Amino acid sequence: MADPSSYRPKPGEIPDSPGVYKFRDEHHRVIYVGKAKSLRQRLASYFQDLAGLHPRTRTMVTTAASVEWTVVSTEVEALQLEYSWIKEYDPRFNVKYRDDKSYPYLAVTMNEEFPRVQVMRGHKRKGVRYFGPYGHAWAIRDTVDLLLRVFPVRTCSAGVFKNAARTGRPCLLGYIGKCSAPCVERVSAEEHRELAEEFCDFMAGRTGTYIRRLERQMTDAAEEMEYEKAARLRDDIGALKKAMEKNAVVLADATDADLIAVAEDELEAAVQIFHVRGGRVRGQRGWVTDKVEAVTTADLVEHALQQLYGEETGDSVPKEVLVPALPDPVEPVQEWLTGRRGSIVSLRIPQRGDKKSLMETVQRNAQQSLALHKTKRASDLTTRSRALEEIAEALDLDSAPLRIECYDISHLQGDDVVASMVVFEDGLQRKSEYRRFQIKSFEGQDDVRSMHEVITRRFRRYLSEKERTGEWADGDLKDGELKDDEGRPKRFAYPPQLVVVDGGQPQVAAAKRALDELGIDDIAVCGLAKRLEEVWLPDDGDPVVLPRTSEGLYLLQRVRDEAHRFAITYQRTKRAKRFRASPLDDVAGLGETRKQALIKHFGSVKKLRSATIDQICEVPGIGRKTAETIAVAFAQAAPAVPAVNTATGEIMEDEEPGTTAGSSQEPVSAGTSDERRGQET
């Protein structure tokens, strides 16, 4: 650990101005970012007697090896720069709110030609309207099912939409009146967009307009003795009112507001947020954070505001934000929120009435969330600590393996050979660190050779990052190598304490040999064989057998199974893309537009394959020479292998070229977040 006096700035060096500062460790990584109204006063507080510092602040300043700062002109600029640096560098000692879960939103993709209503999680996309968050996805689906009677907006995926447009037949929702079926041109793109905008208006809280309009239409229909139409409108009104009843009125003035409450103890804090729109609670979410330094409730509120609104603009930032304590000073934060919204935002503490009552409800939720988290964490932490200790004891390690990486190879009879790397830190999944590999050095089936290649590539990258971050002495750097002074976390910068491979002695030996060839001797290696669940170590003829009730064995099984799942998912994706390749892809000069025209004309690749040259010439834009080239391409191609849904075993029909299960136009299901994070190497 460093002595803070060794890098303390000289007297007079630190300006007495607003600014943002960064602490870096000995490897030049940014470990803490903060802002201050006066840099001189704030930084001086870190270099006082260590005994007087908060324990976690003391750990931070002794871990750091240098400090630097950037002067800004206003406190609002300091707030913006602090947020952007925290997002960029991900400093380990900054307050980080951990979502209790990935909350689902009701999303309307207004950025598409035919907007779609769907459930979405994760990062927000530009051009998409979001409503929520909701506690459960089923709550969104119940609401949408009711509203589709009145606002029959498209809900199908891009693949289903294209297939319906190609065949001229809508999906089931189009037949039962819960979709306006723009895919078969029952309504125009403009009419469908108007429906989507009305859907968004209703979800935004402007409900009275539509209820009154439908009531007038129902009355007019009844007066004209159009009783079936009147009955249908009556049912539509009932559906809208039922959807509204799901969110009781909590604020009589029908305001838009977010209420933030904080419950805390010496080590942790829980934040709860209620999103109120049109006087009704439209969503709720909660976070928990470790208090890495001596922070006040006002500081926690400020961090929560940054987390909530750092990426939001316009109406996503409400007119009113109610908090238990105001940031000090409050003016820069309020000015920043106003800038995000584009109009004045009121940031205040509720004093009386229904807003104070609702704030008390939010506060109770925060207290219950903190109590539940501490109970669960105490149990989980004890179990995880015992599992890591058992692994360390069984493998004769010097300390518990806080970072474990597991590798698995997946292929189908030697085709589409891929590998996965999954990471567990402190016994928990670290999905942002997952990686995927394609085996490049050879073709065919050889798990041992594949394992050697993957381990070599991963740890060669680690050694490269080690050089770039300056972790080796300057004299060890190669000519022309530049040290990376940005301090951002790198993809392969952190080594594990334990490498686990899915397999027995051959795979373990291959992994160990790869590390030895790179000169790495401080990383333990083991393998977990299937069926008997035996743990294999390098150079040991007999496996280590852990008790079946061992928490350590259970953790190793979880790690191994996760690596297997991640690898086989990637392998299936690659296989599906290969199966869906078309001979049309090899026809020179045949662009996407004419491919689509061919598929639309014949209905499928299978029918196109059996067509004559004269029949192909009937397609607009296809001349005889091109038709002959297409016929030759199909004649030379091997018989098409049918694509199979690996989950159900169902043989899938031909689709138009370029459409795959992983198309960027398809929404990714909530259960595959780690596949989205994984990066192909």
From Swiss-Prot:
Disulfide bonds: none annotated. Residues 208-243 form the UVR domain. It is found in: Cytoplasm. Residues 660-672 have a biased composition (Polar residues). SMART domains: GIYc, HhH1. Keywords: Cytoplasm, DNA damage, DNA excision, DNA repair, Excision nuclease, SOS response. Interacts with UvrB in an incision complex. The UvrABC repair system catalyzes the recognition and processing of DNA lesions. UvrC both incises the 5' and 3' sides of the lesion. The N-terminal half is responsible for the 3' incision and the C-terminal half is responsible for the 5' incision. Belongs to the UvrC family. This is UvrABC system protein C.
